[in-house]
Amino acid sequence: NMFLHACLRVVQLWRMGCLVLCGFFLCFGGGAAAFAAPSVEEMAGQMLLVGFKGQEPEECGAILGDIQTRHLGGVILFKRDARNAKLPRNIRDAAQVKRLTAALRGASAGHPLFVAVDQEGGKVARFQPGDGFPAYPSAAELGRGTPDATRRTALGMGRMLRELGVNLNFAPVLDVNVYPASPAIGRLGRSFSADPQAVAAHGAAFADGLNDAGIVAVFKHFPGHGSARADSHKGVTDISATWSERELSPYRSALGRPGQRMVMTGHLFHAGLDPAFPATLSPSVINGLLRGRLGYDGVVVTDDLQMDAIAAEYTL
């Protein structure tokens, strides 16, 4: 059937090492017994991290059921609906979020579950001051200070996330601010600096702060979104003429440090890296560049597959 076909495809990806959520938990918090002999369905489910609608547990029967029966690897919380920003999604206030995340974890039935969020600081913050949460500076603001100050800021953020029941933060951004007017990065203050070494230092410090609070960090958007003239939320983003090897420098540096980190691929097309597919769908970029040349052997996670750079161009 369709689900089994999807499971078999995921097993192939599992063996390729593109996204090993179970392996991550085995290394950092699961224990060998929990993953002694996962079924095909369990492996498939653990490869998926999904969004859902609802704020209170009683509104979330569908996702709670999928966590139980499909063994989902994770969920992600949003403030607003991605397709209609006027509609609320998962976050109202701290007490409500704690009830929701407790129910999500309770449904995992012994399987590890990531509860994720995008909390970079600045304009990219799902937990916002208007809902009673602390305000945090953007990467651009942090980049004007010291890496130690960045680590302390991320530690405070991580402690807040942990208290809310979140254990995975899709931050920090390792994109170099090559093009300050880049609509998805530079214009929003999401890059630490135009200097790759400064990006590496602040990115590593941010990840250290999150890790010290018990939060897994995610470096993004590989291989580099900072030179892009377009926004991958809205369509194909071709960096063939603007990207350079210097944008890999933060990854080379930050990935060499110990810690609980993942790498997120961007929906970025570069004809010289892969003439057919964007990074998210590219064995050449993931297995060849990231795992081969850079030697990364950890978890790789995609950017949102509902973004138009993927959803408008590819079918399942």
Spans of model-derived segments:
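Glycine-rich anion/phosphate-binding loops
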Residues: 93-97, 144-156, 200
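Second-shell residues forming the walls of enzyme active-site clefts
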Residues: 58-62, 87-109, 198-316
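Hydrophobic faces of well-ordered beta-strands that scaffold small-molecule active sites
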Residues: 46-52, 73-77, 115-117, 169-171, ...
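Glycine-rich, aromatic-flanked loop segments that form ligand/cofactor-binding clefts
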Residues: 105-134, 154-177, 199-223
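N-terminal hydrophobic targeting/anchoring segments and the immediately downstream early-domain regions
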Residues: 34-131
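A charged helix-plus-loop insertion that forms the helical arch/lid used to bind
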Residues: 132-145, 189-193
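Bacterial N-terminal signal peptides
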Residues: 16-29
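N-terminal secretory signal peptides that target proteins for export/translocation
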Residues: 1-13
